[in-house]
Amino acid sequence: MLYQIYETQRTMMEPFVDFAQAAAKLYSNPLTPAGQNPLAQRVAAGYSLLYRLGKDYEKPSFGLNTVDVDGTSVAVHERIELDKPFCELRRFKRFTDDPGTLTRLKSHPVVLIVAPLSGHYATLLRDTVKTMLRDHKVYITDWKNARIVPLSEGKFDLDDYVNYVQEFIRHLQGAYGNCHVISVCQPTVPVLAAISLMASRGETTPLSMTMMGGPIDARKSPTAVNNLAMNKS
């Protein structure tokens, strides 16, 4: 029901969003009579804000075609390694014809970057992927927009999130022996849970687990949100 309401709202807003876009261009163009108005820039800014609030933002591409490895430009090919109902495991495979560079590429460690799911695209970490590609074999979780996932695929909750992370880790362990895991912001908690459960079962755990900017213990450095939760719960 929530997505139907959202889509209805977005559809109703489309004419206003299109008008706001056209008006912003009109008032920001100094060659038009409207653009000569002393208040034109303020009016254009208002319409531009309305347009940005209402527009539908499409997923950007990673656009990583080459990467510099020890001073050598190496081609990068992005492909889907695993395709799950709610997530794609993407691989950035590097290619080179230089024997020395190829040997170094093969010796590089494997890293799984777990990107945030809630409200973000994995391309948010484009620069992180680009940097890691210099000396790592890089994989990243590319979460699908839940809005386009068929209801027949069922629900997706924290347990499923943890299972996905474990499946991706096991896949890389099967292909390479083991891997490193980096979680950024929101996925730090499910990644910690996934690896902890693997350890409790006696499974091989990743070589390292890096958790960046995540709410592992939200009681530390409390914010207004923490205080609200403590007072109202």
Positions of the model-derived regions?
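N-terminal cap/leader regions of alpha/beta-hydrolase-fold enzymes
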Residues: M1-S233
